[in-house]
Amino acid sequence: MSQLKVNSIIPRSGVPVGASGGGIVQVVSTRKTDRFTTTSTSFVDITNFQVTITPFSTSNKILIMCCFGQAGTRIATLDHGNAIRVLKNGSIDNNLNADADGTRQRHCYKGVGWSYNADHMPGGVGFCGLDDPSTTSALTYKVQVQCQSSSYAFHMNRPPDNGTGTNIYENATVSHLIAMEVAG
């Protein structure tokens, strides 16, 4: 006679029988290694920087985490920056962006201008948020950016002067966008 002995069986929903929510059901991610630059004063997609996830349950949440290897706007003063928002299936209406407040735009992150040398760019910029989509249909989350002024470009995974030397500030970086389904 065969026996199967286990401490617990975790169902597809990510939560053992008798337990409450919080288990990770699935993880979907994208890794962006190419360099991106824009001077757009309207929101534009960051190319090849989106994830699609299909929740198993309407009660589950989606945790979005984004980390830019390096990103920002290089200027001599700190009065020009950039705005970042996350779209879900093409809509700004999700729990990842700010609530509507008069005529103010809805962002999840506001980047400042960095007054470093032209070849320097800060790194480790990121954000996260928990969305409550209440669906089992596919969800596509993508990141968009907008420049405050077209004179001051937003750069991602590269220094502003796009140097290719061997100095640390000229090195290539990687950015990640991660979606995790969390059991409700």
Residues covered by each model-derived region:
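Glycine-rich, low-complexity segments
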Residues: 3-36
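Solvent-exposed, flexible loop/coil residues
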Residues: 13, 28, 40, 47, ...
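Sequence-level motif detector for i,i+2 pairs with an aromatic at +2
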Residues: 1, 22-25, 59, 174
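Extended, low-complexity regulatory regions
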Residues: 49-53
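General structural feature for long, well-ordered alpha-helical segments within catalytic domains
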Residues: 5, 44-45
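Terminal beta-strand-rich extracellular "head" domains
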Residues: 31, 37, 42, 55-61, ...
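Local beta-strand/beta-hairpin segments that build beta-sheet-rich folds
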Residues: 17, 24-25, 45-48, 93-97, ...
